[in-house]
């Protein structure tokens, strides 16, 4: 295992950031999922040795991360928020960090990292001129310039446009394909689905679930859903839906029907025929429960 945590706790005064987290992370790519404020960043900061746990233990690549400079150079870290010297060029920034990490040929290492993130054409421009996507690539370049065994990425895809997101996903995958490991955090399930099937779910500082992403998808599909169905004749549709065993609660207004169902898969499968038989046209279907927040709430309340 590349990471092992046992009864890990972190608190800031009365605020609990991590609450008795025990987990093991194998080699490869692992997604760390949770809403904002879940404890993901605190977990990552302990993992890279930037912060000490309040109690419990964390081992990374077999070693304790706190106050361990030899381990630190085996890890690459890309923070969520920018921390650039804006007046530097991308090349100067990466070269400086390579030097701090003790890389022997800093210029050559920086050039390799810049080429790897496809920033050679803009490497000698000042960072203050970079777009968000370019800044993200430079942040990833500094995280890999010393060729770490483990790459830790905190919300690397946040705010990126679709094209940049796909480019970043390809870079992360290529790093892992070289036999190294990645831990990447996100609060968006479909982002992680494009990277890996191995995920860890954290909510309010607690480990909620871990394992194959398909199992998490099953949780999303199986937990009770509230479904909004916009239709041209909501009253007629509501009357038809009220007879269905999958529906446990129903209400409607002049534009839509809201249904509560413990069996969303069966409900979605039957809805088209029910609407057709009721002589109503379904215009839109949506569910506020088809997301990670709802899964976290469901798991922590059951």
Residue ranges and their predicted role:
Residues 9, 65, 91, 189, ...:
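Alpha-helix N-cap/helix-start and coil->helix boundary motif
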Residues 169-262:
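ABC transporter nucleotide-binding domain
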Residues 263-302:
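C-terminal coupling/interaction segments
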